[in-house]
């Protein structure tokens, strides 16, 4: 097992050998989609992308060439079949996550994106490429060249990239902006999020989507079931269910104006102001001691010490 990028979550590392083959078994996924549709939800299945999947694996004995050259030709027919099955089940959009784009994977892996997504582009679904955990602004030209209909960017970890994509991303394609932190337990500053997105909304209109920065699997499920938390601390928190509510507030503000969510914004502002100064987490004596430390006292001699 190893960590999923820089998170505290782990995954079982796949091992690739020369005789590795791939077959699609979408029974469980399709059952979940049918269940969601039966409850009236619009669906957007999310998959780990083929380039990221191949890159994350470990090469075993018997592979004498580059992993991507061996694996991707085998992976792509399976991905294409899965996308066609999702389309047949009524999926209009499918999110394909490629966090490799935010890692230092090297040019050989980046060169794989164009042929991979060219092959996946005719499968009957609209594709949203998902990125997270770091900026992908340096790959703007590559991402624009892909035959996909949308892109998700993490603007919590890399807020500076929003300006790059707001200006450079094609206006006829979806830009999904992750401004609600999917990796923590704290309420968002909704007034700040709305102010950040208003000029982007003016440029992109309906092609602006708002989203968590990454999957909400990194957050606990629902704050409402927590009965033993300190009341003050609980008032600063938002778990996955509450973060979805926050997204709804931002959406309404962008579509109907801030007056439509005045009460929600007032509550958000009050929580942010309280957390910024509350004595439960702000100790002036500790701050003074830290400020008095000699220069360099908070740094290790070796980054791995």
What is the predicted function of each stretch?
Residues 1-305:
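Domain-level signal for soluble alpha/beta catalytic cores
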